[in-house]
Swiss-Prot record:
It holds the Pfam family Carn_acyltransf. The active site is at 419 (proton acceptor). It comes from the Eukaryota. Keywords: Acyltransferase, Neurotransmitter biosynthesis, Transferase. GO terms for molecular function: choline O-acetyltransferase activity. The gene is ChAT. This is Choline O-acetyltransferase.
Length: 721
């Protein structure tokens, strides 16, 4: 993983790294002289000697050291099963001909015959016996042998570090939990304290190596899963760069440091709250609550208007990088930035958005389940994703921070998280664990919070005229982006995964086909579709892409629409109810439609399984593309091809975010002309978070949600007995 300063060097590369890992592997886990405690002591001594001889440019070792899971150095029983190279396999490099065959198959439903034929010719040249493809493939195989995860930094840079657009909406998801009922400001402080106490307890569990090992629950069940991303959630932060971003990840020394703090932001004012210190130990919940209460009472009373520094983190990455450089010209600002980066989390204490903020919906939709006053679930999701703009809470954020807990005075709460360090599953599981503990052990009457502690330190920013001007410019830029977001939380309540499973279909596969049908009903075509597939069966595995737009799905969608083509009238659009009750004559029999559906299910399942077992196409294609640049100095024509560009423009970006609580997570589209759609299947309902941009006349979040409703309805009619 990236070190404090280095961001893009290949994981575990270079002779120094190889020597270090050779040294580490010579230690054995057991009792006596080679006990874990002795290993730690020996390791520290070895590193002290190693560091004394290191040069400033020698950074490859950092990635390897920081990639060692903490639990490997613990006394827990299954240490040898936890993310270490000897037990977790490396990400594979699939055979070249297999990747190219699957690539052609993925292009068939989303390209024209002429485009596809051109691509096939390029692939023939690329894959010829004397072509460059075999050479590049061997380059990746060699890279796999030399490194812990040959694809990690290719993928990290492609997905995150090289992207220059703003984080909110475009990259950072927002998550909404069931709202609380706060009667007083003390309730807000106590709830915040309980969340932070849970974060601190989780930190202690990581440090002690007690994080339970997860195993695969499907397809070659019981395989151990890489847990590395769980160790990157707390105390980490993204750093902007003019050309490329980097990551701040806590070093082993910092993980063992007894000082723990969070940064609390209230009304754009920032405070450092120490949760645990070497000179006084861990704060109790009541003591933490007293610190939060101080912030809640102090921030509104300050005479000067606060400097909304957090607003700058919502700007395009290169712009924010230059602003950050200006901030760092003052040493006091440098210290503030360090406190934010090293904080376990950022806690944002918000004011509520107006009830009519960006209000959306459609006639016939089911009512929202959760409300906070006059605010519905869509409104609450806006607050978590972007804060509502410069007049609301967008300056009350630090969008670079991996985890921002957000609590609003009206009971709305959730989080916004920066995506580069971890996938959603690690974030969701951490917050749901803390939330369930709070629900299972309600607040006891602790009386008023204790006030014997010194107050939190308020971070004061020192900015010149140039930065003052940038705040005004950033306000306009951020507000424009937020005004363009078309976002809608839609609950489909006719059925959920209980019915889907009764049809002998995976709920994820079923919903993915519903998303394809909904798109076809509106546009008469399928488009490149992204669904994240976890590759945590492999060392430092993150995700690959399940491409749901298949030829089989296209044939089924065409048949389901009875050949009507694009902009099929939706049942929920019809004003005349009698019209919708008329008998409709089908071109295809139900048996034929069911057979097409089963074929689409089989193909979607096949693609899903290939991806989770490390045999997808997007990671290998990315590797071949980057290898062509590294080996020949230029990108091969195959990756400049129109079909490749189409395949990488994900007009439908989707992901299943399964929550055991009645929570949901949403995000914006990944392209100006596309949709974002997360989903959370429950036994008797499915929650969708649909997003689009108003600046695109061809897309509409509410209309896509309506098409989803109709698609799910007719799929039930097709499959139920």
């Amino acid at each position: 993983m990236a070190s404090n300063e280095a961001s893009t060097s290949a994981a575990g590369s270079g002779p120094e790294s190889a020597a270090l890992f050779s040294k580490l592997r010579s230690f054995s886990i057991g009792s006596g002289p080679n006990s874990p405690q002795r290993v730690v002591s020996n390791l520290r001594g070895f590193l002290t000697h190693r560091l004394s001889n290191i040069t400033p440019s020698d950074t490859g070792w950092k990635d390897s050291i920081l990639s060692i899971p903490k639990k490997w150095l613990s006394t827990a029983e299954s240490v040898d099963e936890f993310g270490f190279p000897d037990t977790l396999p490396k990400v594979p490099v699939p055979a070249l001909d297999e990747t190219m065959a699957d690539y052609i198959r993925a292009l068939e439903p989303i390209t024209t015959p002429a485009q596809l034929e051109r691509t096939k010719e390029l692939i023939r040249q690329f894959s010829a016996p004397q072509g460059i493809g075999a050479r590049l493939h061997q380059y990746l195989l060699d890279k796999r042998e030399a490194e812990d995860n040959w694809a990690y930094y290719y993928w990290l840079n492609e997905m995150y570090m090289d992207i220059r657009i703003p984080l909110p909406i475009n990259s950072n998801p927002g998550m909404v939990f069931p709202p609380r009922r706060f009667k007083t400001v003390h309730d807000v402080a106590h709830f915040a304290a309980r969340l932070l106490d849970g974060i601190l307890s989780h930190r202690e569990m990581l440090d002690s190596g007690e994080l339970p090992l997860e195993r695969a629950a499907s397809r070659e069940k019981n395989q151990p899963l890489c847990m590395a991303q769980y160790y990157r959630l707390l105390g980490s932060c993204r750093r902007p760069g003019v050309k490329q971003d980097s990551q701040f990840l806590p070093s082993r020394e910092r993980l063992n440091d007894e000082d723990r703090h969070v940064v609390v932001i209230c009304r754009n004012q920032m405070y450092c709250v120490v949760l645990q210190a070497s000179d006084r130990g861990k704060l109790s919940e009541s003591e933490i609550a007293s610190q939060i209460l101080y912030v809640l009472s102090d921030a509104p009373c300050l005479p000067a208007k606060p400097v909304p520094v957090g607003l700058l983190t919502a700007e395009p990455r290169s712009t924010w990088a230059r602003d950050r450089e200006m901030l760092q010209e003052d040493e006091r600002n440098q210290r503030n930035l360090e406190l934010i980066e090293t904080a376990q989390v950022v806690l944002c204490l918000d004011e509520p958005l107006a009830g009519n903020f960006n209000a959306r919906g459609f006639t016939g939709a089911t009512p929202t389940v959760h409300r906070a006053g006059d605010r519905d679930e869509t409104n609450m999701a806006h607050e978590m994703i972007h804060g509502g703009g410069s007049e609301y809470n967008s300056g009350n954020r630090w969008f670079d921070k991996t985890m921002q807990l957000i609590i609003c005075t009206d009971g709305t709460w959730g989080l916004c998280y920066e995506h580069s360090c971890s996938e959603g599953i690690a974030v969701v599981q951490l917050l749901e664990k803390i939330y369930k503990k709070i629900e299972e052990h309600p607040d006891e009457d602790n009386g008023l919070p204790q006030h014997h502690l010194p107050p939190p330190e308020r971070l004061e920013w020192h900015v010149g005229p140039q930065l003052q001007l940038r705040f005004a410019q950033a306000s306009k830029s951020v507000d424009k982006c937020i005004d363009d977001l078309d976002f809608y939380v839609y609950r489909y309540q006719s059925y959920g995964k209980t019915f889907i499973k009764s049809c002998q279909v995976s709920p994820d596969v079923y919903i993915q086909l519903a998303l394809q049908l909904a798109h076809y009903k509106l546009y008469g075509r399928l488009v490149a579709t992204y669904e994240s597939a976890s590759t945590r069966r492999f060392l430092h595995g993150r995700v690959d892409c399940i491409r749901a737009a298949s030829t089989e799905a296209l044939e089924w969608a065409k048949a389901m629409c009875q050949g009507e083509g694009a902009n099929v009238p939706l049942e929920s659009d019809r004003e005349d109810e009698e019209e919708s009750r008329k008998v409709k004559f089908s071109i295809y029999s139900k048996d034929h439609l069911r057979e097409l559906f089963r074929c689409a299910v089989a193909r979607q399942t096949e693609v899903m399984v290939k991806n989770i077992l490390g045999n997808g196409i997007d990671i290998p294609l990315l590797g071949l593309r980057e290898a062509s640049i590294e080996v020949t100095g230029e990108m091969h024509e195959l990756f400049k091809d129109e079909s490749y560009i189409i395949s990488q423009c994900f007009l439908l970006s989707t992901s299943q975010v399964a929550c055991s609580t009645d929570s949901f997570m949403g995000y914006g589209p990944v392209t100006p002309r596309g949709y974002g759609c997360s989903y959370n299947p429950h036994p008797e309902q499915i929650v969708f978070c649909v997003s689009a941009f108003y600046s695109c006349e061809d897309t509409s979040a509410s209309r896509y949600a309506k098409s989803l409703q109709d698609s799910l309805d007719i799929m039930r009619d097709l499959l139920q007995n």
